[in-house]
Amino acid sequence: MEKKTIVLGVIGSDCHAVGNKILDHAFTNAGFNVVNIGVLSPQEVFIKAAIETKADAILLSSLYGQGEIDCKGLRQKCDEAGLEGILLYVGGNIVVGKQHWPDVEKRFKDMGYDRVYAPGTPPEVGIADLKKDLNIE
């Protein structure tokens, strides 16, 4: 079976490279073709990479607390670019301060994200979810 392709990166003005490398390593070892666009990445770069690579999913991370602002509108931009239905995952420290996680998760799902991960979620959880969502295994 052909490897599924994912676009991975750190959204917005966030430069946390270590977590991004860990995710890249974990998803690559799990059998995915990872297109890592790195840190400090605007939405348009994720979209362009997804189109160019015919990606099956876009995985965004954020650690600096501004993920909610950075992630807003991505689903609509994906749809407008012809990426209707592409899986969108986001995780990390995606909001400012300590907030009730179910409320945070709901806000991101309302923005069109398929999966939303709290700080400290092991990569294996995202890998299992992605395999399930892509009907792998």
From Swiss-Prot:
Enzyme Commission code: 5.4.99.1
Molecular function per GO: cobalamin binding; metal ion binding; methylaspartate mutase activity
Cofactor: adenosylcob(III)alamin
Gene3D superfamilies: Cobalamin-binding domain
Enzyme class: isomerase
Disulphide bonds in the chain: none
Keyword list, A-Z: Cobalamin, Cobalt, Isomerase, Metal-binding
Keyword hit for Cytoplasm: no
Biological process (GO), any one: anaerobic glutamate catabolic process
Residue sites binding adenosylcob(III)alamin per the record: 13-17, 61-63, 93-97
Reaction catalyzed: (2S,3S)-3-methyl-L-aspartate = L-glutamate
Function (record text): Catalyzes the carbon skeleton rearrangement of L-glutamate to L-threo-3-methylaspartate ((2S,3S)-3-methylaspartate).
Protein name according to UniProt: Glutamate mutase sigma subunit
Taxonomic lineage of the native organism: Bacteria, Bacillati, Bacillota, Clostridia, Eubacteriales
